Amino acid sequence: MGPVKLFDTAGLDEASGLGRKKRAKVFADLKECDLVLLVVDPETDDFATENEIVTKARELDKQILVIYNLFRPDAAERIALVEEQVPLLRFHQKIRLVAIDAQCRPALLQFILENFASKNATMELLPFLQRDEFYVLNIPMDAETPPGRYLRPQAMAAEYITRHWAWPVSYRMDLGKARAGGAGERKRFDAFLAGFGKRPKAIITDSQAMDLMHTWTPDDVGLTTFSIMMINYVSRGRLAAFVNGIEAVASLRAGDRVLIAEACNHSRIAEDIGTVQIPNFIRKHWPDVQIDHNFGREFQENEQLQSYKLVIHCGGCMITAQKLLARIRDLESIGVPYTNYGLFLSYMQGPEALRKVLRPWGIDYAAIA
């Protein structure tokens, strides 16, 4: 199977206050997992917990393998009774063993390998990439930029481009000078593009530079953002769903609530995108909209999410695909639209800017809008 992440669920049937917290954690993990190994003791009298887990796992379309843990030889006689109380168990592959017997381990591993079917689709980071072409990474470093390394999306893009026999070229744009209105920074950028033997095939930019890049990028050069690249990659190709959510921006009204969700906990200083730039855009155009934030790898419960008109999510580069897909599933189940940092910042520059950053992905925003 390769490297795996294991979620343990001790205390799932505890009735105490701590037990309730454990249950909440288990059901959060259930949303993110790919495989549920349900260990059942046939000699138990109450199977309400097992019934609840199987029902919820099936609702979430999770694969379930059942392990009957036999503490006594005659415990197997009760399996029919278990499946009368939890009839859904009959629809899943199962094995009988004595978990405390180390000799059962090979049989358990073989059972898992033979029956687990991964649904993880292999995603290409930049599916539009072509061999022997230049690709520009526009990286306007600021006070938040760590020394000695690229950010993860930048490093991933450079590695992917190189691995696929193309040529990544980094460019540092001075946002302050470019926005000051002088011609010097634009001339420097044009000279940079002119220095290639042939046009770069595409530019991948930091989303915060979209106010400049959507007009500076020549029409014959593709354009997208690191945030859009990452959200498509981590969501396993669900970029179009985030594009659909952008329509909720135009319908924001006074009193609406917007959640800005950022999956990491970096130090937020200066002109941070999530806490400064996006909120400033919202307050400028919709001053009476309430803005909340969700930082880190844990997401809000559905009861809280229902109060939001829109969720604007980061690129998701610091969480797993399973965790992001669990967030998407929650939002879709309660009908809350969601979009992405890069899409939002492009949208705020006008329809043509959004069309431009979606073109490399084969998405026609005009058809959606």
Tell me what each language-model feature is.
Residues 62-65, 70-127, 131-136, 143, ...:
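Canonical P-loop GTPase G-domain recognition
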Residues 148-369:
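C-terminal effector/interaction modules appended to NTPase cores
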Residues 15, 75, 105, 147-148, ...:
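Alpha-helix N-cap/helix-start motif
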Residues 44-47, 73-76, 102, 106, ...:
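Loop/helix-junction capping segments adjacent to catalytic residues or to phosphate/diphosphate-binding pockets
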Residues 11-12, 42-43, 141-143, 209, ...:
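Short glycine-rich anion-binding loops that position phosphate/pyrophosphate groups of nucleotides
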Residues 1-10, 17-96, 123-128, 149-170, ...:
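Conserved C-terminal guanine-recognition region of P-loop GTPase G domains, centered on the G4
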Residues 6, 37-39, 67, 136-138, ...:
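Structural motif
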